Structures are given as C-alpha cells and as structure tokens.
Design a protein with these regions (language model features):
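Conserved N-terminal subdomain of the carbohydrate kinase-like
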Residues: 81-166
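Conserved beta-alpha-beta core of the PfkB/ribokinase-like small-molecule kinase fold
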Residues: 161, 167-257, 264, 273-275, ...
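A short, aliphatic-rich alpha-helical micro-motif
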Residues: 30, 155-157, 228-229
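Hydrophobic beta-strand scaffold residues
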Residues: 82, 108, 192-194, 266
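Conserved phosphate-binding/catalytic region of the ribokinase-like
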Residues: 2-36, 183-187, 247-352
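Short, conserved phosphate/pyrophosphate- and ester-handling motifs at nucleotide-, phospho-/glycolipid
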Residues: 75, 238, 306
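Short glycine/proline- and charge-enriched loop/turn segments
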Residues: 51-58, 208-212, 290-293
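Glycine-rich phosphate/adenosyl-contacting loop at the front of the ribokinase-like
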Residues: 2-107, 130, 146, 298-300
Length: 352
C-alpha cells in the first residue's frame, strides 16, 4: 500500500433499506449479539526468554492474536455476546484461532476458512519495559481477504455494535469490506466502533521488519481514516493514534479535527495515566481533560494492553454504564494484561 497515494472512493452509507430496519425492529433491544468484531486474526509467538533480543530467543509460547480477535475474546471473557468476522487459513494455525475463540464463547460462524491464504503470524519479544520487538508475517494473509461476500445485512443487524480495527481500512479490499459492514450497521441501528490500532508497517510506511514502530506521520493515512470517522459512534486510540486520525502531532489539535468530523464519543488512552472520555466539545488544554486514573502494576508486557482496555470499556458501554464504570473496567483490564506474558489469554474474566 502506498498510503500517500491512496485513493479509494466508497459511496457513503445509504438510507436504511427496509429489510435491515425490519430486522432491527424484530430483535429490538434483545439482539442475539452484543458486538461483532471485524479485523485481524493471527497467532502470536511470544519469546520465553524475557530480556533477550529476538535473535537470541530459543523457545516461544503460542497465543491467539490480532487486535480484533483479542477484543472479541476479551468481550466474551467479560460477559458479552461477541462474534468474530474474519478469515483464517485452511491449516493448523487457522484451526487454532477458531478453536481458541470458541473456547472463550465467541461466535465463529463468520470466521471463514480461506483455502488460498495462510493465517497471519506475529513473532514478539520482551526485551525490557520500553522495548518490545515484533515482526508481522501478514503479506496476503487470510484476514486481509475478508470480503463483502462473507456476511450479509442480517448478520450485522443481529448485533448491537460493530467494531472494526484500523488495519482493515488500509487496503482497497478491506476498506470496501469494512465500509459495507458500516453501511449495514447504520441502516440497522447497530453502533459503529473504531479502534484506530495504528501500525505504520501495516500501512506500508516502514520496512517489513520494523513492526515495533508505533507512529509515522502520513497525510495520506490521516485523510483516508478521516473518511471513516463521520460514520462512528465510538472512537478509541492512544495519543499517537489520535494524532494520525486528526492529522496533527498536537493532541488537542488532532482531537478538534476528529470532533469536526464526528459527534462520536472519543476515548483517549493515556497509558499508565489512565484515559479520558470526550462526548462533546474538546477543551483548550490537555490539563483541562478529566482523566480517569489507571491502575498501578509492575509492567511486563505492554503489547495487547489496548485490546484488553477496549474489551473492558465495551463491557460497560454496551450496558449503558457511566464513564466512571466503563473506564474502571477498561483500565483494570489493561493493567492486568501488561503484568502478564501474552495478550488474549491474559485478558481477565469479569470475576477477576
């Protein structure tokens, strides 16, 4: 993907077709699913030798991975009825992804087996509290081939919310597929949630081996993401992810640009400090933000904390709980994951 030259035209969501409205009315408030997660499905291989370079790793632990998969898994762990919309390969790792989701109670009826592609893999290490080397093996992987043929309006209407993570706007195919899902969602009254989940390497902005870099400014990516924001009900991201969505490295300026484009609730993740939730006007200064404080823990691994945070926030948001409750679960879920080795299996249950 040449993000700077990216030009994809998708018609905006149309007026609600009658069938989607009728389907939504049929279910009313009691839809079969709380949330459908569309996006990355992968297998993570975490190095066991903490403090070592990837070059020096001699053994790895295998976990479910991919941001959308992690969120679907986490939502199920926290008591929500979640489903995954993606593709996996017709091989051992694809079966592993499906079976891990099923063990957590995730609906896998729309996890499609792609016989032409392999499941994406990620190799990760924990060198120290600031250094987490990782390599994405995702070239033409199965989940990037997810298609408009893999779902219909009724499936999207069966959920109260649709979540899409940022990588699935990064190619012509995934953008078209995601926008079709959004169109169905808007027609059915299904809430649209976007976790920006910005990985520069997955937008073609850095070398394939540089999976660790979390931010590279790109006007092309910013403009592209800004075509999605007007359709959202909830947007979540770190400061760097808000920077790419808003097209500015000044957080307040970026937030204001996002707000110009959408009336969505914005959740700004602030790492160990906690988070802030913005429903309306953006304040003039960062000091004016109301920060919901994070939980102090000994950090082992920050990778995947954002996915756990998102699952924790959605647990309350989809139950119409207040910001304080939503953020308490979100911050606690993220904190528990950073204190553990993997991601998906580290996401706490509601009891935890």
């Amino acid at each position: 993907v040449d993000a700077e030259k990216m030009s994809i035209t998708i018609n905006p969501p149309a007026s609600p077709p009658c069938y989607a409205g009728e389907f939504a009315d049929q279910y009313g408030a009691a839809r079969p699913l709380d949330i459908i997660c569309l996006g990355r499905a992968a297998v993570d291989f975490y190095g066991d030798q903490i403090g070592s370079r990837l070059e020096d790793m001699s053994s790895f632990a295998k976990y479910l991975g991919g941001s959308s998969c992690n969120i679907a898994y986490g939502c199920a762990r926290l008591g929500l009825k979640s489903a995954m919309l993606t593709r996996v390969g017709d091989e051992h790792m694809g079966r592993f992804v499906r079976e891990e989701l099923q063990r957590a109670g995730v609906d896998t009826s729309h996890v499609i087996t792609d016989k032409e592609r392999l499941t994406g893999l990620v190799i990760l290490g924990i060198k120290d509290q600031q250094t987490f080397p990782l390599i994405f093996y995702r070239r033409d992987c199965a989940d990037m081939a997810v298609s408009t043929e893999d779902f219909d309006a009724d499936f999207i209407a069966s959920a109260r919310a649709l979540l899409i993570t940022g990588t699935h706007f990064s190619t012509e195919n995934t953008y078209r597929t995601s926008m079709q899902a959004i169109e169905y969602a808007k027609a059915a009254g299904t809430k649209v949630v976007v976790d920006i989940d910005y990985r520069p390497v997955l937008w073609g902005l850095t070398s394939l081996g540089d999976g660790e870099t979390r931010f590279i400014s790109s006007s092309g990516v910013s403009a592209h993401l800004q075509t999605v924001l007007p359709h959202c009900d909830l947007i979540a991201g770190t400061e760097e992810e808000i920077h790419i969505a808003g097209g500015s490295t000044d957080t307040i300026s970026a937030l204001r640009k996002v707000r110009e484009l959408t009336g969505a609730t914005i959740v700004l993740k602030l790492g160990p400090l906690g988070c802030t939730v913005l429903h309306a006007e953006i304040p003039k200064r960062m000091d004016d933000l109301i920060v919901h404080q994070g939980v102090r823990v000994d950090v082992l691994n920050v990778l995947g904390a954002g996915d756990a945070f998102m699952a924790g926030f959605l647990r309350g948001w989809l139950r119409d709980e207040d910001d304080q409750t939503c953020t308490a679960y979100a911050n606690a879920s993220g904190a528990l994951v950073v204190s553990r080795h993997g991601c998906a299996p580290a996401i706490p249950s509601e009891e935890e």
